[in-house]
Swiss-Prot record:
GO-annotated cellular components: chloroplast thylakoid membrane
Topological type in the membrane: Multi-pass membrane protein
Keyword Hydrolase: no
PANTHER family according to UniProt: NAD(P)H-QUINONE OXIDOREDUCTASE SUBUNIT 6, CHLOROPLASTIC
Keywords: Chloroplast, Membrane, NAD, NADP, Plastid, Plastoquinone, Quinone, Thylakoid, Translocase, Transmembrane, Transmembrane helix, Transport
Principal location class: plastid
Enzymatic class: translocase
Localization terms from the record: Plastid, Chloroplast thylakoid membrane
UniProt keyword annotation of Transcription present: no
Subunit structure: NDH is composed of at least 16 different subunits, 5 of which are encoded in the nucleus.
Gene expressing this chain: ndhG
Molecular function per GO: NADH dehydrogenase (ubiquinone) activity; quinone binding
Identification of the protein by name: NAD(P)H-quinone oxidoreductase subunit 6, chloroplastic
A Gene Ontology biological process term: photosynthesis
Length: 176
């Protein structure tokens, strides 16, 4: 979107804070239904961030695939589960939780130090040069198809396998 600077910055901060609040809701809410709705909120915020960065096709795909299909499937799977599974044996803190928290905190600080130490000027300049070269050649949907079949083939296939495993897991949980 071609918005003035302050409005763009406000929307960016608003959506970023929505992502943080929604992510905390996914992790911290004890009720799995509320956690699934919080995940849907996070996915919608990500889609709005794509719209804010002029990636309308990716935003539409995000809404249709993740919010419209995957999150609805997760909500149905959670609704078919027994509530007794979550109400009994609720430990507030275990050793596994501590190890997981330590690993996640370490990864967070490593990412923050990497982001702060990276020279983003060169990355932005290279990206702009590539965009200038690719803009004249073909349309946006053709560019997406070329990148998905060449540069992003392996990540695209890995994501499709992860989604397939999530679908099979959700169906098996729902059947039990």
């Amino acid at each position: 979107m071609d918005l003035p600077g302050p409005i763009h910055d406000f929307l960016l901060v608003f959506l970023g804070s929505g992502l943080l609040v929604g992510g905390l809701g996914v992790v911290l809410l004890p009720n799995p239904i509320f956690s699934a709705f919080s995940l849907g909120f996070v996915l919608v915020c990500i889609s709005l961030l794509y719209i804010l960065s002029n990636s309308h096709f990716v935003a539409a795909a995000q809404l249709l695939i993740y919010v419209g299909a995957i999150n609805v499937l997760i909500i149905f799977a959670v609704m078919f589960m027994n509530d007794s599974e979550y109400s009994t044996d609720f430990n507030l803190w275990t050793i596994g939780n501590g190890i997981t928290s330590l690993v996640c905190t370490t990864i967070l600080f490593l990412l923050m130090s990497t982001i702060l130490d990276t020279s983003w000027y060169g990355v932005i300049w290279t990206t702009k040069l590539n965009q200038i070269l690719e803009q004249d050649l073909i349309s946006n949907s053709q560019q997406i198809g070329i990148h998905l079949s060449t540069d992003f083939f392996l990540p695209f296939e890995l994501i499709s396998i992860i989604l397939l495993v999530a679908l099979i897991g959700a169906i098996s949980v729902a059947r039990q």
